[in-house]
Amino acid sequence: MDDHLKLGDSGVVKNVARLGRRGQRARQAAEQTSLEEPRHVRKSSSSTSMGEGPPPKPARRQGGWAEETSGSAKSGRRPAMVQDVEDRRLRPQTPQGSDGEGDIPVIPDLDEVQEEDLNMQVAAPPSIQVNRVMTYRDLDNDLMKYSAFRTLDGEIDLKLLTKVLAPEQEVREEDVGWDWDHLFTEVSSELLTEWDQGEKEEQVCVMRTSLPKMG
C-alpha cells in the first residue's frame, strides 16, 4: 500500500509539474471543495437532527437598475424640511408691494364707456343744397354789372327792355293794413267814379248822334 501511495504521489507530482501553476491552483481548489463537502453534509445532518431552521440566505448583490431604484427610494424618504425649501424655491415669486390696492387696475363699466364716447362725438352739420332764389336787388346788380346779360344767347338784344325797366322802389308796394270800412269806401268811390265817367261818355255819344238830326 505504501508503495502504491508513493507511486501515486510521484505520479501526482509529475502531473503537477507538468500542469504548472494553473494546474496547482485548480488542484488545490478541488481538494478544498472535496474536503468542505463532507463538513457541510455533517452540519446539515446535525442541524436537521437538532430541529433548527434552514440556514440564512446569502445577501444578494444588487447592480444596475437596482441601485438607482434604491437611491430613489432613499431620496423619497428625505426630510420634510428639505421638501419645503424646494417647494418655496419652485413657487413663482411675486414682487413685493404688488398686492396693494393702488396697483389693482379698475375696469370701467360699459355704460360709462358708452357715455364718454357719446360726449366726445360731435354731430356733423347737415349738407343740404339749397337753391338760392335771386332777389330784385341781385338781378339789378347783375344787370348793371354784367353787360353780357343784355344779350340773350348772343342774338337777342335786351337793351330796349333794360331801358324800360322801372326801379325797385317804384314797383314794390308798401304793406298796408286793410280796414273794412276804409276798404269799402275806397272801392265804392272808385266804382262811382267809373259809373259817372260811363254815364258822361254815354251822354256825350247821345248828344253827338242827336245833333245832325236836329240840323
Curated annotation (Swiss-Prot):
Gene encoding it? ift43b
Q: Name one GO biological process term.
A: intraciliary retrograde transport
Self-association state and partner proteins as the record states: Component of IFT complex A.
Q: What does this protein do?
A: Component of IFT complex A (IFT-A) involved in retrograde ciliary transport along microtubules from the ciliary tip to the base.
Q: Which family does it belong to?
A: Belongs to the IFT43 family.
This chain belongs to the protein called Intraflagellar transport protein 43 homolog B
The record's keywords, sorted A to Z, are: Cilium biogenesis/degradation
Look up the record and report any one GO term of the cellular component aspect.
cilium
Using the UniProt annotation, give all residue ranges assigned to the region (Disordered): 1-107
